[in-house]
Curated annotation (Swiss-Prot):
Pfam families: RH1, RILP. One of its GO terms (molecular function) is small GTPase binding. Residues 241-257 have a biased composition (Basic and acidic residues). The gene is rilpl1. This is RILP-like protein 1. It comes from Danio rerio. Belongs to the RILPL family. CDD domains: RILP-like (cd14445). Its main location: cytoplasm. It is found in: Cytoplasm, Cytosol; Cytoplasm, Cytoskeleton, Microtubule organizing center, Centrosome; Cell projection, Cilium. One of its GO terms (cellular component) is membrane. Residues 105-319 form a coiled coil. Residues 234-272, 323-351 are annotated as: Disordered.
Length: 406
């Protein structure tokens, strides 16, 4: 099944790869490396495994970066389009303002020209009035006609000025209305853009939370698989150790039986006397009568104490591994993905990836092998000498219970 998953993950293209595919590839490589270690040993692959882990971590980061959702891309494109429209409208407003400024400048120039003409006409009128007051002579018909002509000219100029001013005023009002409409459109677009930006931020936050939850679940899965593999390896190693001890016990029992069946030399007179006394006191039909010498009984007790010591050391090793498993199971709780995303994402802290946890069984195998070598080298005679009396019974009972559980 795992080989099929590896083949399916490797058959996919680079754009279709997901984080789960990367973890499937890592699990399959871990199994292959485990097989190679079982055949050749872990020393040959001690330098290769960290490099494989680093390559798989880089592949995981690249796949997680490339697997962005299409909704965020669409929102990004929409936001870029709105920004372009806003820039175009701002440029149009600038052009419109420049045109209005030009119109105002033209109007001001024309108004100044007209004011200059009015001032000139007023001065001419004053001069004429002064001339009339100085002369104090009755006006002739020619003077009256000239005065009427001048007034009509002034009226025509004033009328033209008024028409021009009214026309420019109407144009300015129309431009002001257009400006207000454009400003309303710009405000509406800004509100829409802010709303879209908020929606985009919410979507990004949700996507990041979902990605963080998915990564945490994948890491939990990888941790459980690695823990299961290590437990299986430990159980298999303990079974092998127990089977080896059982075989050793059988061999020792066989050797004891062979020693018991060997012929004994001629006894001394004192021994014959003791044997006669024992035979006289012991019933030959009793099934529980003594059949071994004192030295043989001492040898059996010495072997029993050695086996008790080995079983006790194995029991301590099992308790140590169980405590390690309980510490791994009762590890620190996972942090909230939303709180971790709110913190600084560019911090220097990098959590241990699932691939490193998956390949952590290599280091555990080394520690187990070193511990076994230490147990095999340690002398047993010192531990056996201190076990006497009631402690021997307690240790034998605990060792038997441990063997039954295994």
């Amino acid at each position: 099944m795992e080989e099929q998953q590896l083949g399916a993950a490797l058959d996919k293209s680079a754009a279709e790869l997901s984080v789960m595919d990367v973890y499937d590839i890592a699990a399959a490589l871990g199994l292959e490396l485990e097989r190679v270690i079982e055949r050749t040993g872990a020393e040959l692959l001690s330098r290769l495994v960290p490099r494989v882990v680093r390559v798989l971590e880089l592949l995981e980061v690249l796949v997680s970066r490339s697997s962005s959702s299409p909704d965020t891309d669409e929102l990004r494109l929409e936001l870029d389009r709105l920004r372009l429209e806003r820039l175009e409208r701002l440029e149009k407003e600038k052009k419109h303002k420049k045109e209005l400024e030009l119109v105002e400048d033209v109007w001001r120039g024309e108004a100044q020209d007209l004011l200059c003409q009015i001032s000139q006409l007023q001065e001419e009128n004053k001069t004429l009035l002064n001339n009339l007051s100085i002369r104090e002579s009755p006006l002739t018909e020619e003077d009256i006609q000239k005065q009427e002509g001048m007034t009509e000219r002034e009226r025509q100029v004033m009328k033209k000025l008024k028409e021009v001013v009214d026309k420019q005023r109407d144009e300015i009002r129309a431009k002001d209305r257009e400006l207000t409409l454009k400003n309303d459109d710009v405000e509406a677009l800004q509100q829409q853009m802010s709303r879209l930006m908020k929606i985009n931020q919410d979507v990004r936050h949700r996507v990041s939370v979902v990605e963080a939850q998915g990564k945490s679940l994948i890491q939990q899965k990888v941790e459980l698989e690695a823990a299961a593999q290590t437990q299986q390896q430990e159980v298999s190693s303990l079974r092998q150790e127990v089977s080896r001890l059982k075989e050793k016990l059988k061999e020792q029992s066989r050797s004891n039986e062979e020693e018991a069946q060997e012929p004994v030399g001629p006894p001394s007179p004192a021994q014959e006397a003791l044997c006669d006394e024992d035979l006289s006191t012991v019933d030959l039909k009793d099934p529980n009568r003594p059949r071994f010498t004192l030295q043989e009984l001492r040898d059996v007790l010495h072997e029993r104490n050695e086996l008790k010591a080995k079983v006790f050391m194995l029991q301590e090793e099992i308790a140590y591994y169980r405590s390690e498993e309980q510490e791994e199971e009762n590890g620190p709780p996972l942090p909230d993905p939303s709180e971790t995303l709110r913190t600084n994402p560019r911090s220097n802290f990098q959590p241990e990836s699932g691939i490193k946890r998956l390949f952590s069984f290599f280091s555990r195998d080394r520690s187990v092998s070193q511990r076994r070598m230490m147990l095999n080298v340690e002398p047993v005679g010192d531990a056996v000498g201190s076990w006497t009396g009631k402690q021997e019974d307690v240790y034998t009972e605990t060792a038997q219970e441990a063997l039954q559980h295994m």
